[in-house]
C-alpha cells in the first residue's frame, strides 16, 4: 500500500500548486517535488478493475506475475469493449482484486519445489477472481 501513500503525496502537492503561484520559490520547490515523485512512479501502469472501472496503479512486477496474467486472459473473454489497446481492464470485483494484490504482495515466490503446485493453482485462483 506504499504506492497509495506516494500517490497521496503527489496529489496533495498538485493541489497546492495553484495556491503557491504567488511565491515563485515555493512553486519551484513543489514542482521539483512532484517531478521526483512522478519519476519514482514511472514503472507504474493504470489498470481498471470491476464494473465501476476503478483505477489502480500497478508495478510491472505485479503485472508480470503469472496469476495476474491469467486474470487478464480470463478478463478479456468477458470484456468486449476495448476503447484502445493500452487500456487494461480486469473483470474482477474490487474487493477481491484488493485481496489479490495483498496476496501478491505478501507471497514469497522463493519456493522452487512449489512451482508446479503454484502453476496449477494459478488457473483456479484466476477463475475464482473473475466474474
Swiss-Prot record:
Keywords on record: Developmental protein, Ethylene signaling pathway, Growth regulation
GO biological process terms on file: ethylene-activated signaling pathway; response to auxin
Miscellaneous comment in the UniProt entry for this protein: Plants silencing SAUR77 exhibit increased sensitivity to ethylene, while plants over-expressing SAUR77 display reduced ethylene sensitivity. Plants over-expressing SAUR77 exhibit increased rosette diameters.
Function: May be involved in the regulation of ethylene receptor signaling. Promotes cell expansion and plant growth.
Family to which the UniProt record says this protein belongs: Belongs to the ARG7 family.
Protein name, entry field: Auxin-responsive protein SAUR77
Organism name: Arabidopsis thaliana
Amino acid at each position: 500500500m506504499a504506492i497509495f501513500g506516494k500517490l497521496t503525496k503527489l496529489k496533495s502537492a498538485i493541489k497546492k500548486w495553484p495556491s503557491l503561484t504567488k511565491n515563485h520559490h515555493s512553486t519551484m520547490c513543489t514542482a521539483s517535488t512532484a517531478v521526483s515523485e512522478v519519476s519514482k512512479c514511472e514503472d507504474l501502469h493504470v489498470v481498471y478493475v470491476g464494473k465501476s472501472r476503478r483505477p489502480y496503479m500497478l508495478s510491472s512486477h505485479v503485472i508480470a506475475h503469472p496469476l495476474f496474467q491469467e486474470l487478464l486472459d480470463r478478463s478479456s473473454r468477458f470484456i468486449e469493449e476495448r476503447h484502445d489497446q493500452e487500456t487494461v481492464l480486469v473483470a474482477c470485483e474490487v474487493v477481491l482484486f484488493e485481496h489479490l494484490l495483498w496476496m501478491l504482495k505478501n507471497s514469497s515466490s522463493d519456493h522452487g519445489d512449489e512451482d508446479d503446485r503454484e502453476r496449477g493453482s494459478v488457473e483456479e485462483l484466476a477463475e475464482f477472481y473473475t466474474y
